[in-house]
UniProtKB/Swiss-Prot annotation:
UniProt modification remark: Lys-53 undergoes hypusination, a unique post-translational modification that consists in the addition of a butylamino group from spermidine to lysine side chain, leading to the formation of the unusual amino acid hypusine. eIF-5As are the only known proteins to undergo this modification, which is essential for their function.
Record-listed Hypusine modification sites: 53
SUPFAM superfamilies hit by this protein: Nucleic acid-binding proteins, Translation proteins SH3-like domain
Protein name in UniProt: Eukaryotic translation initiation factor 5A
NCBIfam families: eIF_5A
GO terms under cellular component: cytoplasm
Key words of the record: Cytoplasm, Elongation factor, Hypusine, Initiation factor, Protein biosynthesis, RNA-binding
Amino acid sequence: MSDEDHDFAHQGGGDNASKTYPMAAGALKKGGYVCINGRPCKVIDLSVSKTGKHGHAKVSIVATDIFTGNRLEDQAPSTHNVEVPFVKTFTYSVLDIQPNEDPSLPSHLSLMDDEGESREDLDMPPDAALATQIKEQFDSGKEVLVVVVSAMGTEQVLQTKNAAEK
């Protein structure tokens, strides 16, 4: 069976060439990352089928999109490469929350890293509960730390931390 017999959305490089690197499907680990349908995902379950009469063992991958939380599944021969995203996490202090002129859009965040560098290009997270938690902590006068995850050209606030956890 050739690769053309499969619809591997995670093959090739395309626009994500420098945002991913290849790894043998059989080398993936639970808790690691993989691209499925062009989306960066965290692996939550892996299973390997036995080698069949046509050669390769198959790896079944169950993962969640790191930005949306959607569950995705894929399969690949264990010896074939899949794309793995470069995932980076950063912790920032929230300096200010500026409401958007359009109330239907998320508020903008003013953030500062440990070196004192500021940035104002991120919005409140789409997760309403997390956005509310950030706003309530900020409004109460507490120092608010947010964890920003960056992968495949997307950056998003995914959680808050206590200042003591820094």
